[in-house]
Amino acid sequence: LHLLSRRQRQMCIRDRLSAIAVDKGVQPVIVCTKADLGEVEFLRSAYERSTLPFIAIRYDSGEGLDEVRQWISGRLCAFCGNSGVGKSTLLNTLLPQAERETSAISQKLGRGRHTTREVTIFEAFGGRIADTPGFASLEANRAGFIPKENLEHAFPEFGPYLGQCQFTGCSHRSEKGCAVRAALAEGRLSQTRYDSYCAMYEEVKDVKDWQRPKV
């Protein structure tokens, strides 16, 4: 769940979370809870090319809420995102008896105050919802570590182009004959998603085997 202002920081956190989920075999669903801020179509376009489900919420009309309920049904779901993006507001709308505290966004910092301080699990719609505390940042080499050789697989839209690069072990950043970069240049991949991939790769590229977190 992500607030759609402060675009660059939010995009990195969103893409890191989704990449970690994909790497761990968990289905991420992108839910925009501030759909009235005018950037929904920008994100919708990026995620249509990513193959990840995208839901825009409009509280005035109820748009998107049924889709969220359907994803919860029969599953254990976690509401994740940085502070102030609307996790508690969405939970209160879906499940009024949850009575989660909410807060406004700081205009100076561009993020909200932590109102959820522990993980709480709620039974709802034939499934379960885990409401998690927010956070201010997410480092790729610490939170849900993904080795550099696996990172390309955490971005599903890269899939059709993997194995087509000129060089084995291509990092898809600067090499000649890179099929991923060619797809990006042709508009078949989202520039913002690609930028997130590069930022994550930069953080983990020099991590040695002995430095990697133990699974």
Question: Which residues fall in each region the model found?
Answer:
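Canonical P-loop GTPase G-domain recognition
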Residues: D36-V85
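Helix-rich effector regions associated with P-loop NTPase G domains
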Residues: R6, A19-P28, A35, S50-P53, ...
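Single conserved hydrophobic/aromatic residue that forms the stacking wall/gate
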Residues: L1-R9, I13
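Phosphate/Mg2+-binding loops and adjacent switch elements
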Residues: R16, V22-K24, V40-F42
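Polybasic, low-complexity association/targeting segments
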Residues: C80-G81, G86, H114, E118-V119
